[in-house]
């Protein structure tokens, strides 16, 4: 891990109003995501997405590519969580790794399924989130996966994302 002197927005001690608290949390998460990419050897990009495929945050990735990646990898996460195992039960996938000629892709469930599974504060109207990481082909897959888990522990307080609801729709 490198030792960056840069501090997260919350660590600066700047007082905020309740209206800007959500913005500060988002900035803190974005800072953690950028630091993760800077600190973990071989990792080149990271995207936090909603389970339904919307890009929430990224590590300064091209926005069009991050949007495309978010849509595709939410599908990967969905498929992985709907495969029955040897017990004939659907269980959440802890991690999916895709090995390509040009990169390694890692997908881990975040939010309720990883950070808040079985927690009594789970409320209706929330959607799971997913962390996607892109690494070089020679990256240490075990180290990248381990560091993703550590990042998700740091994200845990921020991981509940409201479900999108259209006009006239209600959350069911």
Where are these regions (language model features)?
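Non-catalytic interaction/Regulatory regions outside core domains
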Residues: 1-45, 51, 55-172
């Amino acid at each position: 891990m490198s030792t960056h002197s840069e501090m997260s927005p919350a660590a600066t001690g700047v007082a905020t109003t309740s209206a800007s608290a959500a913005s500060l949390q988002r900035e803190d998460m974005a800072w953690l995501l950028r630091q993760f990419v800077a600190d973990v050897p071989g990792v080149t990009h990271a995207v936090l997405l909603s389970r339904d495929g919307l890009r929430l945050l990224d590590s300064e990735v091209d926005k069009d590519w991050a949007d495309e990646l978010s849509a595709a990898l939410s599908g990967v996460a969905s498929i992985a969580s709907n495969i029955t195992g040897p017990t004939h039960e659907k269980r959440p996938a802890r991690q999916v790794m895709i090995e390509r000629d040009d990169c390694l892709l890692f997908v881990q469930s975040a939010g309720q399924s990883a950070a808040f599974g079985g927690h009594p504060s789970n409320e209706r109207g929330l959607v799971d989130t997913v962390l996607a990481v892109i690494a070089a082909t020679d990256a240490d897959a075990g180290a990248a996966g381990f560091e993703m888990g550590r990042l998700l522990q740091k994200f845990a307080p921020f991981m509940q994302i409201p479900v999108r609801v259209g006009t006239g729709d209600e959350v069911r």
